[in-house]
Regions:
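Nucleotide-activated donor-binding/catalytic signature segment of Leloir-type glycosyltransferases, i.e.
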Residues: 70-99
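Donor nucleotide-sugar binding/catalytic pocket of nucleotide-sugar-dependent glycosyltransferases
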Residues: 1-13, 17-21
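A short, well-ordered alpha-helix in the C-terminal region of glycosyltransferases
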Residues: 166, 173, 180-195, 201-207
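Conserved acidic donor-binding segment of nucleotide-sugar-dependent glycosyltransferases
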Residues: 151-153, 157-164, 173-178
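Conserved donor-binding/catalytic core segment of Leloir-type glycosyltransferases
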Residues: 16-35, 41-48, 56-59
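Short hydrophobic beta-strand element within catalytic cores of glycosyltransferases
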Residues: 137-140
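Short alpha-helical donor nucleotide-sugar binding micro-motif in glycosyltransferases
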Residues: 99, 107-112
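Aromatic "clamp/platform" in nucleotide-sugar-dependent glycosyltransferases that forms part
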Residues: 120
Length: 218
């Protein structure tokens, strides 16, 4: 077994509560339906009732459009996202960031009050690892290998993927509890530095290939 090694940019930098945008959420991608953007919008609608100033920052271009022809050409899921945004009056609560490189992604992690990963399907998402190694407090759906990356209520929050009210609850818990943010940040960084240690992962990968080569030679 070999853990993931992250892009080099994410091994430099550290999340700081005092410097983050309070009541902000960062989501690394949203236009693939399995990434759960629709659940994030449902949760955002709940959060906004208690935190009217909440902002969701997400990569990609805005789905909001008045162009009928454009709507017919794009994926149905994008039209569904637009419908939810307008239904819940979230137009001013979301910032679409366009396409970001690794350094720009890192900046968004560091500026976020909370990183959210509301995916329906995952393996071991690098986005969660990137947030953890930088120390950004994480709220993630409990899918795939995420529970092997992050211990619930010690290094972040895990929740049932199709329960946006739980996502909203845990995000607001971190908005309200600065000490919990500090605790998660410290513990997650410590765990991620081991999981994503580049030298250890390289050594493990070499051992795997060596083992395969030895079996072939036999």
């Amino acid at each position: 077994f070999c853990n993931e090694t992250l892009r080099p940019e994410f091994y430099v930098g550290e999340w700081n509560y005092e410097k983050c945008r309070k009541h902000s959420i960062f989501m690394s991608q949203g236009y693939n339906s399995i990434k759960g953007m629709h659940y994030m919008l449902e949760a955002l609608n709940i959060i906004k009732r208690f935190y009217p100033d909440v902002k969701l920052y997400v990569t990609g271009t805005s789905p909001l459009s008045r162009n009928w022809i454009e709507k017919q050409k794009r994926p149905v899921y994008v039209n569904y996202l637009e419908k939810l945004i307008r239904q819940y009056s979230l137009e001013n609560s979301i910032v679409f960031l366009g396409s970001l490189n690794a350094e720009e992604m890192k900046e968004q992690y560091l500026l976020a009050n909370v990183f959210a990963s509301p995916s329906s399907i995952e393996n071991s998402p690098n986005s969660v690892g990137e947030a953890m190694i930088l120390g950004t407090p994480v709220v993630s759906s409990d899918v795939g290998g995420v529970k092997n990356m992050l211990t619930h209520n010690e290094e972040g929050f895990l929740y049932q993927h199709d329960a946006p009210y739980m996502l909203a609850f845990y995000v607001m818990e971190l908005f309200e509890n600065k000490e919990k943010c500090f605790e998660f940040s410290k513990n997650a960084k410590q765990h991620a530095k081991t999981t994503h240690d580049a030298n250890q992962n390289l050594s493990a990968l070499i051992d795997i290939y060596r083992s395969i080569a030895q079996k072939i030679e036999r």
